[in-house]
Structure formats: structure tokens, C-alpha cells
From Swiss-Prot:
Protein name: Elongation factor 1-delta 2
Compositional bias ranges of the Basic and acidic residues kind: 119-129
SUPFAM superfamilies with a match to the protein in the record: eEF-1beta-like, GST C-terminal domain-like
Acetylation keyword on record: yes
GO cellular component, one term: eukaryotic translation elongation factor 1 complex
Amino acid sequence: MAAFPNLNSGSGLKKLDEHLLTRSYITGYQASKDDITVFTALSKPPTSEFVNVSRWFNHIDALLRISGVSAEGSGVIVEGSSPITEEAVATPPAADSKDTAAEEEDDDDVDLFGEETEEEKKAAEERAASVKASTKKKESGKSSVLMDIKPWDDETDMKKLEEAVRSIQMEGLFWGASKLVPVGYGIKKLHIMCTIVDDLVSIDTMIEEQLTVEPINEYVQSCDIVAFNKI
């Protein structure tokens, strides 16, 4: 069971950021109620200072907007926060009685058996297509990738190298944590993590067509995949 201090403090966010350095979710290998517990404990979106928390927060926010989260999880404790219960997830807030009464009055004026207009048919088709697309996206697998990126020499500006790497943006690609690793003779290489949607991003293609060609190859000599794990 994971445990965190107050997540609205710098120390709490730092611990959560370290926890998510090598994880996509709070516990397990899919989004669960543990993620919702931590998500709701945050009073506001994390700043970009906490790279891993920001990546996780945006991912969970997107999941909640699209399809929700149903996995049970293995348990998490957040200081000052209560665990998410079945009732909290399943029970919507009660509607205002006045609003409900007004809606019921409005319903009396609606012709429930009128013919469907062309606009209504088109809207229904668009909704069906949207549901189908979101279902397909939900089923698509994801992978966590650790890449090893080497500069040309010790004079290469590693800050600009990382900026050039992160400038690659595409649907299904999410950059994560990074660090500089000494190689020798004053040279350092970049280790950087990313999460990809398998159906949308090919790491091999990205390396061949973007990371090792102009203008990024001004800084990058070579790029290798150190670890590739299905999520």
C-alpha cells in the first residue's frame, strides 16, 4: 500500500513525483481508485516543476473525462484525505429540487413522439462515431520507454539537446523524467523516459525520422532504446 504526506505541500508533491518516476499509476499497471484518491487530494494541478506528477495528473484527468476508472487498486493513504468509496464514485450529487421541478415542467412541452429531424439524425451519428472512436482509443495498448541519447562531444549543450528532444510532439507521445549520466572524459548522455500509445507512435520511426535528422542531429549523435515495457 502506497502512502503519501499532505499532497498540497512541496514535500508531499516531491515524494509523489519520486514515486511516479518509474510508474504510470499510483499502484498496479492500470488506473484504479487509488489514482482517484490521490487525484482528488490535490487542490490544484501540479506545476511543471513536478514533471512526473504533471504527466500522471494530465493522464488521469483525460481518463476521467473520456471513460472513467473502474479498477479497484491495492490501496493508498494520503494524509488529510479519505479513500474513494463505491458510493462516492457511483452516486452523483443530488439535483436541486427547484431545478428538477422546472425540468419536469419543461418536459411537458416536449413532443416525445415527434419525427426525428435531419439535424437530430446527424447529431446521433456523430455521437455514435465519437463513442466508437473513444472505445478504440481505450483499448489501445501503451508502453513505457527509456531512451539513451548521446551527444557529439563534451562541448554539446545538453540543455539544448534535451529541449530539442522534447520539442518532438505528436498524438500518443508523453515525455517523462530525464537525467544526465556521466560517460567519461567530461561527456554526459541523456536518459529520458516517455510513454507512448502503441497504435499511434513508433519509437523506431521517431528515432530514424526525427531524433537523428536535422535539426536535432546538431546535438544528437545517436539514440538507443534501453528499456521498453508494456503498460
